[in-house]
Amino acid sequence: MIIYLHGFDSNSPGNHEKVLQLQFIDPDVRFVNYSTLHPKHDMQHLIKEVHKLIEESDDTKPLICGVGLGGYWAERIGFLCGIKQVIFNPNLNPSVNMEGRIDRPEEYIDIGTKCVADFREKNAGNCLCVLSTNDEVLDNQLTSDALSDFYKIIWDETQNHKFKKISQHLQAMKAFKE
């Protein structure tokens, strides 16, 4: 089972396309929707939904995947639920770069203080990070600097922030999932 978390643009047709692409490596892909506007509520909702999906699944090696803001959540929720994560262009600092787009960006700071201390050290090796060199939203060199001590980084030379096409990374994801 692969659990897919969308980014800030939850209505993007690219989300459906990514789900279809993910089905090439696992026919059981679950799309979990969340508001994107209320971080504390989103975190509670995502933990509950992901935990429920894991409990209902026979897959002994489920994977959670997200793009942008979905990558932020996939890393954390996957860690908290004990499953591997694949994150594409994760938004590591939504409290800074989501200001003006969501109601309470400061809640991300609060969430960060409530998570397990040094969670990336404890999560080392359980997350695969794919970063675009053409990300028009985030500086992915900063993202790489923050994550490369803990996770394998794959650089993509063609996609932009929304990562419409993930197919070139499916085999790496499949190998990582196993």
UniProtKB/Swiss-Prot annotation:
Name this protein carries in UniProt: UPF0227 protein PBPRA2397
Family: Belongs to the UPF0227 family.
Pfam families named in the record: UPF0227 (PF05728)
